[in-house]
Amino acid sequence: FKEGDIMLPPGKKAFVLSQDDVCYYEYMDGDGFASRMVIGEDGKPTCEMKLDDGSVVTGDYDLVPILNRFIEEHPGFSYKGAKGVLAFTGYNGILGYRTAASYSESPTYESDREMAAAVAQCLRDDGWELASHSWGHRNMGQISMENFITDTTKWENEVDSLIGPTDIILYPFGADIGDWRLYTTENERFNYLYAAGFRYFCNVDSNQYW
């Protein structure tokens, strides 16, 4: 890593926008959240929501379509089409599709995986970055190394296989695998994640860096 200048048009400020847990977990059903992300009639990612009467509507029901709508009205907000970072766990599937191996007996399992992969590619094409949030929403700095490896392997098998390679991880719980100092090759967890292809290691934290 080497610090440098971020070149932007005058008056613009760089910041990182991220959303984790973009999975639409089962526990969220019936609580006013979107149920899943889909590809809209315009070819852009949007959200479905199930209403109390059982009907399904499509619209701006989460960050992705809300931000896309804002950028349509304020194109100067997005520099060269950049959007944000969306991070996924895997234990309940991704994007509202039950893609985890635990759902493999479901009659919609294969179609869910196909649809999730298509939506993930649509997000990439639309300027979004995709990232890991661990497979099981684990504290990656506190779990045993054995569980750390198991979690990362599950994420590779059940999520990476759908969204394609990513080099970004957003740690759950605002946790970290080190302290405030730079990672070194003496950090076994850093070495493992680096070997798995990760290059950007992010906390869930809105504070300025030190």
Go through the PLM ranges and name each one.
Residues 2, 8-15, 23-178, 207:
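Metal-dependent polysaccharide deacetylase catalytic core of the NodB/CE4 family, i.e.
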Residues 5-6, 191:
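Short, flexible, glycine/charge-rich loop motifs used to bind or transfer phosphoryl groups or to couple energy/partner
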Residues 18:
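Generic enzyme active-site microenvironment
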Residues 179-185:
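Short glycine/threonine-rich loop-to-helix capping motif typified by GTGT followed
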